[in-house]
Every structure is written in C-alpha cells, then in structure tokens.
Amino acid sequence: MKIWIDADACPRVVKEIVSRASERLKVPVCLVANTDLSRAHTSLVTSVRVKAGFDVADDYIAENAEACDLVITADIPLAARVVEKGGVALDPRGELYTEENVGERLSYRNLMAELRTDGMLLGGPAQLGLTDRNRFASALDRLLTKMVREHRPQ
C-alpha cells in the first residue's frame, strides 16, 4: 500500500497532513511533480520528478498506482483513471472519488471548463479553507485506517 500525491497543484498543507499520517501509520508516500520536491523527503516520503508537459505526472501516477493504493488529487480525469483501475482517490477537500460519483464530477468539470473558455465564468475553485483542511484530515484518517487494516498482514 502506498499514497501517491499529484503534487504539482496540491496545497502544501495537504502534503503536510499526508506526511504526518504517513509517519503515524507507516505508509509510504510518493510525490509526483514536474518540479524538484526532494527536500520533502523523509524515511517514508519520496518523490518522482517527471518531464514538464500536459498530464505527464497524471500519466505516471495512473500507470504506477495499484488497486491497494490511495491517490490524492484534485484532477478529476486522473481520479477517474484511478477509480477505473480499482484504486482509491481523494481530493484535497476530503471528497472521495467513487465509481458512483466520478462520472458526474467529470461531466461537471468539463461543463465548467467550457463555460470558462466561452468567457461565461471566471476563475476556478475557491482557495482551500480551514474547513476544507479539517474535512481532508478527517477523511484521510478514516480512509487510511480502513485501508491499512485491510491491506496489512495480520
């Protein structure tokens, strides 16, 4: 079991929350980005630097994450790929992507992108607030506790 973080756009506070949970539960983490994240390394946290380019980090995660892994991402197309493979994906606001909701979230994302392209909508999602951080930390704790119980040998 491993935690993968789509680290290019992941808020620093989310990476810190994941790092603390990783240390507590002894679950390895891999940050994937097109920038150097080696200073974030600990005994359980590593990073992979990919080439700059559209969806390169997403492709790396989708190809390397396994069904027993957790992927932290705000990228809905990546989450859809992970869920399709049988993996688990969580967004930085603590919302779990599931087979039941990922298609709807992908459609909504595409609609919003189209509205922004047409100039009918400005900006993106709101900045991560304290409520979002707390929701993420709680969701991560519940999810990791369950996953560790299921995937660690007794």
UniProtKB/Swiss-Prot annotation:
Ranges that cross the membrane: none
Coiled coil: none
InterPro entries cross-referenced by the UniProt entry: UPF0178
Highest taxon in the source lineage: Bacteria
Family to which this protein belongs: Belongs to the UPF0178 family.
Protein known as: UPF0178 protein GM21_2006
Organism field: Geobacter sp. (strain M21)
